[in-house]
């Protein structure tokens, strides 16, 4: 099973944000990575939600079927693990992630501290 680390960062001075994701095998070797910079600013929760969505889309595109989606936003990971539905804008973004999770045979969610997500975070700054 591979691990998909994802992270999103707001560059408030430039009023843009960056997203990054890294797919690693169970030995920790990088299989694939992807970054993107967008010019519109969003809230931190929106950025993390959109990054998770893009990470799952990317993983599905490259043929991943079993994965652990790991991020450093505890609120985001908790929201994905809970089966709570709401019409709040951020909840709709969480629903997008849940819909994409149906493309996987097995998908687990895991929280890591920022230090554990350093590769994805560093990619954003590149």
Regions found by a protein language model. Name each.
Residues 1-126:
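Primary recognition of RNase H-like, Mg2+-dependent phosphodiesterase/nuclease domains
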């Amino acid at each position: 099973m591979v691990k998909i680390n994802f992270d999103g960062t707001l560059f408030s001075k430039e009023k843009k944000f960056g997203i990054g994701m890294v797919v690693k095998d169970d030995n920790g070797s990088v299989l694939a990575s992807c970054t993107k910079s967008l010019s519109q600013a969003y809230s931190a929760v929106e950025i993390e939600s959109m990054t998770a969505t893009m990470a799952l889309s990317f993983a599905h595109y490259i043929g991943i079927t079993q994965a652990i989606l790991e991020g450093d936003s505890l609120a985001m990971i908790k929201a994905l693990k809970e089966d709570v539905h709401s019409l709040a804008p951020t909840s709709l973004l969480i629903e997008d992630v849940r819909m994409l999770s149906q493309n996987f045979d097995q998908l687990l969610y895991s929280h890591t501290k920022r230090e554990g997500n350093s590769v994805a975070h560093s990619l954003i700054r590149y």
